[in-house]
């Protein structure tokens, strides 16, 4: 599609949620562009780990809590070997699991079987940075003792000592007096209907123009 549209239009934008450097197809897409001598520019975004960290008040690194973080994904058993599970269980810093909430029961069990401490805390952030954001807190032990849960997609898991800071510094989903809330979702603004009407109008114009070109 990139090659096709690059041949049709002067400028083409390929949008992706988060940041294209994390868990994306950027390598394949850049290779395709390079093979076809198509010039490109990469604009960085905010990856889910950073967004969820900011909107929960849970830093990925913090003095006396974590000196580093590992970003992983776990969508099937073959992705992580038993040897790697042992390394993760012994890892004393922050673990962040992308696109893995549906397999969280397996993740917790693998870590416990590999010798991880039962009291390691973690949070599951559902729909991070949106007005629908919800956060659920667990420890490895407490999660293993409850029935399997369903989480709203997309969700991200932040695991390690830093997760214990959520209760203290959570500002988005709380009545915390220090929560300034300078930024509000557009739904709360009086101009939302005007913006919605403008977008609908432009979409309608685009559809009509496309129909004319096809006919």
Describe the residue ranges of each PLM region:
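Short glycine-cluster motifs
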Residues: 4-75
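A contiguous loop/helix-start segment that scaffolds small-molecule binding in enzyme catalytic cores
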Residues: 7-13, 25, 29-31, 68, ...
């Amino acid at each position: 599609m990139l090659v096709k549209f690059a041949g049709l239009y002067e400028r083409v934008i390929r949008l992706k949620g988060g940041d294209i450097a994390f868990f994306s197809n950027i390598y394949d897409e850049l290779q395709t562009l390079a093979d076809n001598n198509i010039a490109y520019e990469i604009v960085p975004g905010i990856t889910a780990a950073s967004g969820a960290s900011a909107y929960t008040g849970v830093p990925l690194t913090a003095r006396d809590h974590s000196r580093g973080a590992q970003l992983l994904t776990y969508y099937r058993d073959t992705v992580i070997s038993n040897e790697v599970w042992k390394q993760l269980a012994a890892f004393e810093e922050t673990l962040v699991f992308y696109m893995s909430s549906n397999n969280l029961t397996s993740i917790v069990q693998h870590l416990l079987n590999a010798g991880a401490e039962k009291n390691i805390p973690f949070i599951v952030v559902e729909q991070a940075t949106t007005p629908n954001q919800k956060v659920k807190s667990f420890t490895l032990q407490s999660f293993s003792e409850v029935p399997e849960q369903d989480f709203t997609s997309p969700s991200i898991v932040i695991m390690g000592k830093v997760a214990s800071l959520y209760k203290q510094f959570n500002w988005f989903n709380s009545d915390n007096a220090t929560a300034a809330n300078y930024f509000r979702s557009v739904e709360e603004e009086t101009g939302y209907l005007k913006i919605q009407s403008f977008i609908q109008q432009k979409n309608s114009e685009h559809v009509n123009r496309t129909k004319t070109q096809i006919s």
